[in-house]
């Protein structure tokens, strides 16, 4: 009998449930999970994605020797010190969400100083927003998930929340929300820029080698086509790719 082919070694990553980008309930572990999986397959490995609360995911992904890193993260100067970032594996477009019957008007982030804003602990929303929040210029209240913030917004416990645009649409498309609730939510899209996201490989010699191998493999994979096909198959209203 011919010998059975050996199973490829798994490359493990830590993340949190963040549909439609990462979820154990979605095909390929979500859109970004699918993109990463395609590159890792090209490298000759299988992909294993484990789910934790976000702060725990960062701790495990960056420091547990059984993991290659954390997926997926926006680059900023602070994070550059803790990991080796891959080339882009997608993008995120943060928006300010509020209720139509209580609109929030702001020409720039600094104009939100009187608005109580829901965020998620451990997330980066861009250097400007993060700096304003750290300085106390913005009144932010961290929660443990975007889902909780959406519920708080609808319950009027927040005047506004910051959230990824396509994730908001995905969450509101769930059956637990009525069409009337979906229609109550409006977004301001101009306050944040679209940002690329990356695999955050551990800041070790092995992590650097993995990051370089990942980037080489990514150049041989048509990630844009995979993303287009994924959104088409998902058929989530308004969830077309956002160009970086």
Predicted regions and their residues:
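Ligand-binding clefts/hinges and TM-proximal coupling segments of bilobed small-molecule sensing domains
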Residues: 46, 124-138, 180-181, 215-244
């Amino acid at each position: 009998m011919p010998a059975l082919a050996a199973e490829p070694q798994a490359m493990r990553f830590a993340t949190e449930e963040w549909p439609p980008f990462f979820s154990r309930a979605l095909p390929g572990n979500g859109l970004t999970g699918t993109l990463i999986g395609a590159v890792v397959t090209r490298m000759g490995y299988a992909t294993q994605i484990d789910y934790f609360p976000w702060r725990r995911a960062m701790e495990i992904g960056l420091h547990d020797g059984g993991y290659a890193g954390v997926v997926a993260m926006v680059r900023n100067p602070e994070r550059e010190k803790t990991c080796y970032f891959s080339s882009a594996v997608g993008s995120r477009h943060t928006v300010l969400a509020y209720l139509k019957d209580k609109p929030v008007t702001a020409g720039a982030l600094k104009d939100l100083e009187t608005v109580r804003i829901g965020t998620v602990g451990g997330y980066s929303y861009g250097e400007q927003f993060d700096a304003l929040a750290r300085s106390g210029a913005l009144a932010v209240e961290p929660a443990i998930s975007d889902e909780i913030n959406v519920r708080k917004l609808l319950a009027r416990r927040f005047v506004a929340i910051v959230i990824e645009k396509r994730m908001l649409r995905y969450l509101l498309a769930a059956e637990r929300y009525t069409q009337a609730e979906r229609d109550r939510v409006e977004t301001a899209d101009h306050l944040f820029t679209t940002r690329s996201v990356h695999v955050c490989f551990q800041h070790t010699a092995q992590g650097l080698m993995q990051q370089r191998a990942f980037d080489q493999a990514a150049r041989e994979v048509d990630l844009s086509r995979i993303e287009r096909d994924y959104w088409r198959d998902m058929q989530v209203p308004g969830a077309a790719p956002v160009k970086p």
